[in-house]
Amino acid sequence: MKKIYLLLLTIIPLLYSCYGGEDSTDITNIQQVTAVSGISNDTYKLYQGDTLKLSPTLSFSEGADTTLYTYRWLIGKSEVISNSRNLTWPVCLPNGYSMAGNIPGVFVVQNKENGLEFRQTFTFQVYSNYTPSCVVVYEKDDNTIEWMSLQGEPADFTRYFDNMIQRINPEEPVKGKYTGALYSTNELAIFTNNHPDYGKCISMRNADPDNGYLYNVGEYTGNVYGKMYMGATPSLNIHNCVFGYGASKYFICNDILHVFNGLDRKLPVFNESTFVKSTEVQQALSSKQFQRYKKATFVLHKDGHVGCYHVYDDVMENVKIDGKPFVLDSLYGCFTEATGMGSNKPYSVYLLGSKDGEFNLYRFYVNYINRVVQPLTLEAKMPVDATFAKTTKFWWGSFGESYGFYTIDNSIYRFDYYEMNSFEPSQAKKLITFDADEEIIDVFPLIPGMGLRDEDDCTVVLLYKKATNTSSLYVYDTVTGRKIKEYKDIIPGKAVYFTKCL
């Protein structure tokens, strides 16, 4: 203890000596940087050949002379890449680091007179030329299926490469009718009706032999039949494929609903007896906000009864209303409530379904007790006009606001579901209308960055123009409808699938 007191008594006068001027000026008057903004806390995903541009905003102490500061940008093992305040850096892999690994960086602002430094750290990863940050799968007019690698963020893709199969596997095109796709971090499966392979499994990352991964971006890792499916059934019908990061991934194969761990980076291996959630399944439907926080999935069986499950390894419940089985003819749409809360917290889920020609919007309450999910409770049953319901195509919700959305023809509508106990289409606002010759193929609401959070980023819409057999990506602010970016006719075919890579 004596040594500690002695050390403190020695240091304190030194601090006053360094920070204090004449008459013992308060250390808060020292010229210094007080904050730096404009550098993301999320990991930057960069590509060789691109240019990283960062323009941080600096806040200084009152009265500071901003001409007295120097700047340094360091990456990796203290490699200086710039001495300017704003960074413009041609991306390359620093010495001693591997592709896709986390690389440290720091922005240093130093006062030349008093030597004080402010350091803002960041992290980035470097990927090869073809490594995707987003993927589009599309059908071509020669009855083959292709995929596109897009790099950057949806708000500003820096590069994109179409016809990736033609580039890397020109002798083995993906043939047959597209039935679905499943992303699994390391790989992408494209399912078809083509016998005997029933589709291809494709690497989405570079080889990492030290960790047993031997395939580069775009290379086939195997056929669906033989790599994923390991059973004895001679034919496969895989469809209704969904990937919810942190929740589960699932598809229906030959009327069997198979559900897998949403965190597994590899494509699943299965047969008729493994990963079975239910059999005699007609349809499965989750919210488009499907992820770890909102993971209810409704399962419609061929006999009409509706089940529900929440994670890949739980037991599906048969939903009941007033003690009787919940029975429907079809599931039309689903979206979840924006709560701002994390995983295993209560929320409401909305389901649009039909029975005997009548449509209703059901609101169920999902409750957790000690992190254990409880049976669904019906909160409200709202009649929906049948003619209207049949004209809608997609339903989804905002991650952060109490808004729901649906599409009719080439328009997107927004409605407020806060304290909603009846559904009135007349109260909805037409948010966006696309060109008359463009068909909405699908809609994908996204969250910011690479993590999980109940927060809106943007929504990506796949649009198809039949006259030119081309597809576009339209990116807009999820809540306001404000256009962020449009990538007009960049896809040489009919887009059928989009995913953000993790």
Which residues are covered by each model-predicted region?
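Preference for solvent-exposed, low-hydrophobicity sequence contexts
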Residues: M164-E171, T185-W395, F399-E401, R414-K429, ...
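Repeat-based blade/solenoid architectures
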Residues: V174, V327-C334, V384-T392, F434-I447, ...
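Signature of short aromatic-glycine-proline-rich micro-motifs recurring in repeat-based ectodomains
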Residues: K175-A181, T185-L188, I238-H239, T391, ...
